[in-house]
UniProtKB/Swiss-Prot annotation:
It is found in: Cell inner membrane. Belongs to the GSP L family. The lineage of its organism: Bacteria, Pseudomonadati, Pseudomonadota, Gammaproteobacteria, Enterobacterales. It comes from Escherichia coli (strain K12). This is Putative type II secretion system protein L. Part of a cryptic operon that encodes proteins involved in type II secretion machinery in other organisms, but is not expressed in strain K12. Induction: Silenced by the DNA-binding protein H-NS under standard growth conditions. Its main location: membrane. Type II secretion system is composed of four main components: the outer membrane complex, the inner membrane complex, the cytoplasmic secretion ATPase and the periplasm-spanning pseudopilus. Forms homodimers. Interacts with GspM. Interacts with GspE and GspF.
Amino acid sequence: MPESLMVIRSSSTLRKHWEWMTFSADSVSSVHTLTDDLPLESLADQPGAGNVHLLIPPEGLLYRSLTLPNAKYKLTAQTLQWLAEETLPDNTQDWHWTVVDKQNESVEVIGIQSEKLSRYLERLHTAGLNVTRVLPDGCYLPWEVDSWTLVNQQTSWLIRSAAHAFNELDEHWLQHLAAQFPPENMLCYGVVPHGVAAANPLIQHPEIPSLSLYSADIAFQRYDMLHGIFRKQKTVSKSGKWLARLAVSCLVLAILSFVGSRSIALWHTLKIEDQLQQQQQETWQRYFPQIKRTHNFRFYFKQQLAQQYPEAVPLLYHLQTLLLEHPELQLMEANYSQKQKSLTLKMSAKSEANIDRFCELTQSWLPMEKTEKDPVSGVWTVRNSGK
């Protein structure tokens, strides 16, 4: 290892504290917890403060499997945004995407809101820490095909359920996930919760801090979100700055000359582009009046990307977050089928208005509707047909 390294693990909704540890050529520190007496700024004097790997909790990330038009399709920040746009819970936000795997026309990506990533980087920069890599928390957990890896964190469980799928759930939601999608194999650090089991015998290890599984010898480069507009610029010398300014000045003069000689042709081109854009929009409105779109009409006509039905882990996270915010609702039973595109919940509530409010709050990510109430138990059935 060429230099000291510090790994910082951000807090999450279920785990309120930050953690950190350091690596050097001849030693590895234990896992430490930040407190009011030991804030983030106190790490600026520690070894590795100039080479920080930041771990972001899975709750702030999106995982998507995308299909390209063809194997040679050029992937850029813009084309990734187009491909993922129909699957976003809120397409008004600007998302930053990282390709973690590509097999022919199939692409696995991880997304984070650009504003959120900027806040993370600004916070560590203000604390005097130099971030050189940003990774999803959980990417360092050991994993094998058709298996889960679980780490007990006292208040929650850190989970790696697939090659590029990481999440953090409390015990209640972990039990729901395991009941609906039991894995073939399971590796567990800590005592496995009651009702969580795999098809094959459990591989059990003593409980340890999840961060202690991080390895400084593994690059984790495929998961690094510090790229594109977030990539750090190298320092430029004074002579380099002067040459850069000269080059920019020459380029500006060349552009002005080109614009001056081609202004009429450019004006006609822009006018034609506006006409074509308006024609495409009119055609889109004629065929798809219920879907509002303002750009990239040809791409969506060709691909006709439909809203994907949510995968189990992010769906459970949405439900978990919603129920934590509304204690007047209690989940009694959940039945989920991604194949049949259906979700059925049995819920109890203080009043029917609480159930109506729950259905209203789910409209942005998975519309739910109440169907019936058990006259004896008072339990409501809420479902989504997936159609």
